[in-house]
């Protein structure tokens, strides 16, 4: 699987969980202590996310890191 397709699947999963929790990108960014535009870039697969930020986003969404990883990864 290409690096780009992994980023796309990860971003889709973040968006799916965020929307299911009725959170805006801005609200998630605040909870994760990252910039709002960063969340958008992750969801659109425009940014290569670090492990530290994966953990921040997982914690902000109250999910485990593995929950952010698509089952097909």
What is the role of each PLM region?
Residues 34-47:
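Recognition helix of helix-turn-helix/homeodomain-like DNA-binding domains
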Residues 12-30:
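Short basic helix-loop element that most often maps to the first helix and adjoining turn
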Residues 62-73:
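Short C-terminal boundary/hinge segments that cap the last helix of small helical domains
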Residues 14, 28-29, 39-42, 68:
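Conserved hydrophobic/aromatic packing and binding residues within compact polymer-binding modules
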Residues 1-9:
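A detector for short, charged/polar N-terminal pre-domain segments
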Residues 54-58, 68-69:
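Hydrophobic micro-packing sites on short alpha-helices
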Residues 46-56:
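Short, basic-rich loop-to-helix N-cap that marks the start of a DNA-contacting helix
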């Amino acid at each position: 699987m290409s690096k780009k397709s992994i980023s796309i699947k990860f971003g889709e999963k973040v968006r799916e969980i965020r929307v299911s929790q009725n959170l805006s990108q801005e609200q998630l960014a605040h909870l994760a202590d990252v910039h709002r535009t960063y969340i958008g870039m992750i969801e659109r697969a425009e940014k290569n996310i670090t492990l530290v930020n994966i953990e921040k986003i997982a914690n902000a969404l109250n999910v485990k890191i593995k929950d952010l990883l698509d089952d097909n990864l």
